[in-house]
Design a protein with these regions (language model features):
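Single conserved hydrophobic/aromatic residue that forms the stacking wall/gate
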Residues: 1-10, 14, 445-455
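Early extracytoplasmic/domain-onset interaction patches
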Residues: 2, 11-51
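Short, hydrophobic/aromatic-enriched beta-strand segments in well-ordered soluble domains
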Residues: 33-35, 52-54, 124-138, 195-203, ...
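A surface-exposed beta-strand-loop module
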Residues: 38, 73-151, 249-255
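Glycine/proline-rich low-complexity spacer/linker segments in large multi-domain proteins
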Residues: 60-74, 133-195
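Hydrophobic helix-coil surface modules that form long, contiguous segments used
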Residues: 166-177, 183-375, 404
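Catalytic Zn2+-binding segment of zinc metalloproteases
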Residues: 381-392
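Acidic/His/Gly-enriched intrinsically disordered linker/tail segments
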Residues: 399, 403-447, 451, 455
């Protein structure tokens, strides 16, 4: 672990190695991980906590108990969401210590506690392994921040995958463990770490993920490698690594076998990825004073012509504007992935909606809605992915800062951009709304200084 990570006062930092397999026939993920957890706090830790977000969909989950509504709010998705046959949630198959012996643990709903044999002293580390699997949810029917979209016309799946592994909770010096249950609507509190992830997918799939692709020479064709290198030099227009014609050909094939994509990411608080044989892939470089960033997009043909015209250019524009107003983007890539009806962010990668009609036409509302969601979700790389606030407790922190910068970025995209937010008068309708749905901004610090609310 690098000294700069420790010197910033992070309560905990860890290294993680993961091996994942995507079963495209059963829509299932199987994974194993090795976690090296460093206790950088001043406290002895009697146990460690991990987050099991997929247990939100397990039978008996508390998330079902808090959902409210009325007959007027019922729609097809609501009815589908009531169906009990989806068997969601993590299936933890093995937890072991570094030497392979059994590690004691306790699962409580969306949290898992690692019961240590002896306290983990300050400045020491603990290594353990977890094996698991879970069924991927059909996001178009039962919703979710991640899942799959099924394309019936060509019998293909597009996977946008997140919260897919047992994730470390945060331990800080003011509150201890942040182990509030995940009910679905709240977001996340996460520590920084280094990720080494191998993802086995069908051999004809294209994968996008947090971090650098480190085995491109093994999985990409010579032509694709040439295109990728060209994209790293092109600042004006995106370069297609996989174009639409190639993607259409690819989605019609069913090649046998699996291929492993290998990604590494340093100093990130989470990991997300996407996989499909439908993906078109384009990229261009954004040059900064401190480093170059590869802006990329992955999308099915159903996203065109909108996505090939605007997605990657919007990613690049967002990086330039946010970096101008804040700091240079420190990561090597920034990725926009298209799936329908979504807007969700993870380090270096985000999942965005905005789809033309079936005939390829689209309204101004669709166009600007797509551009705005890309700006917003790419912008979340700065808040909270880099400025690491506690989303579970203080959602307004990252959303407020990000929405403000989103407005500035939209106005620089083109003159007269139809921003939904920005000027003060735009908040009036919200403030006049149902008071039961308006949460006050409360600073619930547990010490006189707010220094620990952001890492």
């Amino acid at each position: 672990i690098r000294e700069d990570m420790v010197s910033r006062g992070l309560g905990d930092v860890y290294k993680r190695q993961m091996n994942l397999t995507l079963n495209d026939q059963q829509q299932k993920i199987t994974g194993s991980e090795t976690i090296i957890y460093h206790n950088n706090s001043q406290d002895k830790l009697e146990y460690l906590w991990l987050q099991l977000d997929q247990n939100k969909r397990a039978q008996g989950s508390d998330s079902y108990k808090i959902q409210t509504g009325n007959i007027k709010s019922l729609n097809t998705r609501s009815i589908k969401n009531m169906e009990p046959e989806f068997e969601g949630g993590f299936n933890i198959t093995n937890v072991t210590k570094k030497d392979g012996s059994k590690q004691a643990y306790t699962i409580h709903k969306t949290m898992m506690r690692i019961n240590l044999d002896k306290p983990l002293l300050p400045g020491t580390n603990f290594t353990f392994n977890v094996d698991w699997w879970y069924n991927i949810n059909n996001r178009m029917e039962i919703g979710g921040r991640s899942g799959y979209e099924y394309f019936e016309e060509d019998d293909n799946y597009l996977y946008t995958i997140a919260q897919f592994f047992p994730r470390m909770c945060v331990y800080n010096d003011t509150e201890g463990w942040q182990n509030k249950q995940f009910l679905g609507s709240g977001e996340f509190t996460l520590p920084f770490g280094d990720y080494d992830v191998k993802i086995a997918v069908p051999t004809d799939h294209v994968v996008a993920a947090t971090g650098n692709l480190v085995n491109a020479n093994e999985i990409l064709s010579e032509e694709q490698i040439k295109r990728l290198e060209l994209a790293k030099k092109n600042e004006k227009e995106p370069v297609f690594i996989v174009n639409e014609k190639e993607a259409i050909k690819n989605e019609k094939q069913r090649k046998k076998g699996m291929k492993t994509w290998h990604f590494k990411a340093e100093n990130v608080r989470d990991f997300g990825w996407a996989s499909s044989r439908k993906f078109i892939w384009d990229a261009m470089v954004v040059k900064q004073k401190s480093n170059d960033v590869l802006a990329m997009s992955f999308y099915p043909k159903e996203g065109n012509p909108l996505w090939e015209q605007y997605s990657t250019k919007t990613v690049a524009h967002t990086l330039k504007c946010y970096s101008k107003y804040t700091f240079d983007y420190p990561y090597p890539v920034a990725i926009s992935v298209h799936s329908k009806w979504i807007g969700m962010e993870y380090p270096m990668i985000c999942f965005n909606g905005g789809r033309p009609d079936e005939d390829g036409t689209y309204s101004k509302r669709t166009k600007y809605g797509m551009i705005s969601v890309i700006i917003h979700e790419v912008g979340h790389n700065y808040f909270p992915m880099i400025i690491n606030s506690d989303e579970r407790q203080w959602t307004w922190m990252d959303e407020g800062l990000n929405t403000f910068l989103q407005y500035l970025t939209e106005q620089e995209f083109e003159k007269g951009y139809p921003s939904r937010r920005g000027p003060a008068y735009r908040i009036v309708d919200y403030m006049k709304g149902n008071k039961k749905r308006i949460s006050p901004i409360c600073l619930l610090y547990t010490s006189p200084s707010p220094r620990d609310t952001m890492s």
